[in-house]
Amino acid sequence: MQEFTNPFPIGSSSLIHCMTNEISCEMLANGILALGCKPVMADDPREVLDFTKQSQALFINLGHLSAEKEKAIRIAASYAAQVCLPMVVDAVGVTASSIRKSLVRDLLDYRPTVLKGNMSEIRSLVGLKHHGVGVDASAKDQETEDLLQVLKDWCQTYHGMSFLVTGPKDLVVSKNQVAVLGNGCAELDWITGTGDLVGALTAVFLSQGKTGFEASCLAVSYLNIAAEKIVVQGMGLEEFRYQVLNQLSLLRRDENWLDTIKGEVYE
């Protein structure tokens, strides 16, 4: 798509601080390395500030929350807001947990660059009817007409923030633009951690100076296109998971990968 510029080669090996869960941390670390940056995962309140100060972007994922981790998240987010460090917040599980929803709404005061979630999570967060269960989106929540206007209003309230809403069609919404993106394959939903990986890749592109809108579009499209290249080969899920990381490192060598992004951008 002509709207975006190729982020590769990565200009500097940025340090990406991921506050994520134990299930997906290895995939995120390897995905960040595959793009040419460096990961760090620190969620102890006693040291989290030290690592955040050294980082070029912060990714907060609520996939495995505890009281101690919440304390660390608040410390890191507060610092990020003070120094304008690019920050991605992944609102995992807000459909099921009032604690998580309350935390995400508090984090909005720190003006994250990108707020990410699946369709049910984002509908729940902004006060729309939803049918999500646990951390999964519902097929009943894929209607976007009512959601888009609410998200635009939120972007006006939280100036500078973009929404990344994942689903069969991925939505990226900023104050002035909307992208509806169509790459991807069903197999990505069959292995754990791929949604978390999108958030981490968004942080990578933010560390390279991309806006929240562009970083979100690039991240979700990059992973989806990598997966499309694999699924045509036909393989089991464990091999598919391995090849996702493999393709992430290979796709960046393709100078024309942006041409394979499916979707539209609207002003």
UniProtKB/Swiss-Prot annotation:
CDD domains: THZ_kinase
GO molecular function terms attached to this record: ATP binding; hydroxyethylthiazole kinase activity; magnesium ion binding
Residues engaged in binding ATP: K116, T166
Keyword Transmembrane on entry: no
Swiss-Prot/TrEMBL keywords: ATP-binding, Kinase, Magnesium, Metal-binding, Nucleotide-binding, Thiamine biosynthesis, Transferase
Positions of substrate binding: M41, G193
Alphabetical list of Pfam families matching this protein: HK
Enzyme's top EC category: transferase
Family as reported in the entry's similarity comment: Belongs to the Thz kinase family.
UniProt protein name: Hydroxyethylthiazole kinase 2
